[in-house]
Amino acid sequence: ANAGNVQYTLKGIKGFFWKGFLYKLEKNFAHKLVVLLSNLKIVPKIEIKFLTNSVIAKYTKKKNIFNYLRLSQVKETMLVNSRSFDIFKNDTPEVNENQIVLLDEMLNTSEWSRFRNPIHRDKINEHYFKLTKLLRALSNMFDKEIVICLHPKDDFDLKKKYFEDFRVVQHKTRENICKSFIVLFFESSAIIDALLLRKKMITIISKVMDQNQIDGGLHYHKHAGIMIINIDQNLNFEKEDFLKQLDEITKKYNYYINTYITP
C-alpha cells in the first residue's frame, strides 16, 4: 500500500452477518492479544512506527491513561512523508494532461468477498457496460484518449475484453497518472500520486459494489472533497460547469496532503 492513503474500517455486509462477525472477531482479538502479550513482555514491542497520518500521530502524544501507562505496543512513533512525495521530490516525472485515466477495481477479490458472496457475472457485465459508457462520454467531451490502469494482480486478458475500445495497461499506473487530465478510480492508494500532482479526480460507485467498496471511495470524497459519480444514474454533463467543478475541487486537496501525505 502507498503510505498516505486514508485507512478505513471494513465492516460486515447486510445479509452476511457471520462473515462480518468472524472477520471483526479475528481482527480485533488478534490486535488486542498482541497488545496484551507485548505489555506482559511475552512478545517484544515495536521500537518505532513510521506514520504519514498526523491525526494518529497527535493521538499517540495525547495525555490519557493509555499513553501515560505506556500500554501501546509501539514505543515511539515518527512522522514521515509519503513514498509518493519522496519519489516526486527526487525524480520529477513528465507531467501533462493528454489522457483520461481509469484505475479499475477488482470487484471479486478475497478482500471484498470475505464479507459477501461473489458478484454474479451478469451484474459485472452490466457494471462495465455503464462504466465504458461514461468513459466514452468523457473521451468525446474532452477529446482525450482513455487509458485503463490495472492492479498488478488483476486479470489483464479479461479486462481487455471489457475495455476493448480503450488502451489497457498494467504496472504503469504512476506514469499514466502523470499524463492524466482526469483520474477516475474506485478505491486505490495509487491516487496519492494524483493528489500530489493536483489532478482532477472522480471516484466511481455503482449498485454492484458492496458497502466496503463504496466506502473506500467515499473516504476520499470526505477527506479530500473528490467528486463522486454513480454510473447507475442518468449522466448529463455540461462541459464548462463540469470542468469548473473539477478545478474547484483540486483547491481542496491541501488539507488532505498536509494531514496525510506530507505532515
Regions found by a protein language model. Give the residues of each.
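Donor nucleotide-activated moiety binding/catalytic core segment of transferases
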Residues: 82, 144-197, 201
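Active-site and donor-binding regions of nucleotide-sugar-utilizing enzymes
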Residues: 1-89, 191
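Nucleotide-sugar donor-binding and catalytic loop/hinge architecture
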Residues: 86-110
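Structural motif
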Residues: 48, 99, 181-182
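Short, acidic/turn-prone active-site loops that include or flank metal/cofactor-
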Residues: 2-6, 81-85, 170-175, 206-211
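A solvent-exposed, charged loop/short amphipathic helix patch at secondary-structure junctions
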Residues: 108-130
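Catalytic donor nucleotide-activated moiety binding site of glycosyltransferases and closely related
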Residues: 102, 126-170, 217-224
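Catalytic binding pocket for nucleotide-activated donors in carbohydrate/polymer assembly enzymes
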Residues: 160-164, 189-262
